[in-house]
Structures are given as structure tokens and as C-alpha cells.
């Protein structure tokens, strides 16, 4: 029983860590470094470094 309660506690503790990662992405302007694009909430923009920039109208490249 103690083992089960410890497992449930660790699962609950893992959720705030994921939320804090989400917050850090939002603080950086919604940048997703693994695919070099911004998250959907940022709109149609792509990443350059740690900030998001508007897409060029004629090409899908960062300005």
C-alpha cells in the first residue's frame, strides 16, 4: 500500500514539472527548438534562436 501511494505521489509531482516546461517555452516566445517552429498559440511564425519572428509572405522562412 505504501508503494502504491508513493507511485501516485510521484505521478502527481511529475505534472507540475511538465507545466513549468510549458511556461518556459511561453516565456521564450513560444519557441519549440526541436522543430524550429513556434507553438500554435504564437500564430504562424517560425523560430530564430530563442525568439519567434513573423514568416515572410512569399516564403516559409524566418525574416
UniProtKB/Swiss-Prot annotation:
The entry's keywords: Disulfide bond, Knottin, Neurotoxin, Secreted, Signal, Toxin
Q: Which cellular component terms (GO) are annotated to the entry?
A: extracellular region
Tissue distribution: Expressed by the venom gland.
In the record, what terms sit under GO molecular function?
A: toxin activity
Q: Which cysteines are joined by disulfide bonds?
A: 31-47, 38-52, 46-62
Q: Where is it localised? A: Secreted
Q: Which residues form the propeptide?
A: 15-28
The record, for Pfam families, names:
Toxin_7
Domain of life the protein comes from: Eukaryota
Keyword field contains Glycoprotein? no
Signal peptide (residue range)? 1-14
Domain-related comment: The presence of a 'disulfide through disulfide knot' structurally defines this protein as a knottin.
Q: Tell me the protein family, please.
A: Belongs to the neurotoxin 01 (U2-agtx) family.
The task this protein performs is described as: Insect active toxin causing rapid but reversible paralysis in crickets. No activity shown in mammals. Does not show effect on mammalian voltage-gated calcium channels.
Entry protein name: U2-agatoxin-Ao1v
Organism annotation = Agelena orientalis (Funnel-web spider)
Amino acid at each position: 500500500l505504501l508503494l502504491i501511494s508513493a507511485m501516485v505521489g510521484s505521478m502527481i509531482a511529475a505534472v507540475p514539472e511538465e507545466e513549468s516546461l510549458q511556461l518556459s517555452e511561453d516565456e521564450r516566445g513560444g519557441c519549440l527548438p526541436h522543430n524550429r517552429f513556434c507553438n500554435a498559440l504564437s500564430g504562424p511564425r517560425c523560430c530564430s534562436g530563442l525568439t519567434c519572428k513573423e514568416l515572410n509572405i512569399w516564403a516559409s522562412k524566418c525574416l
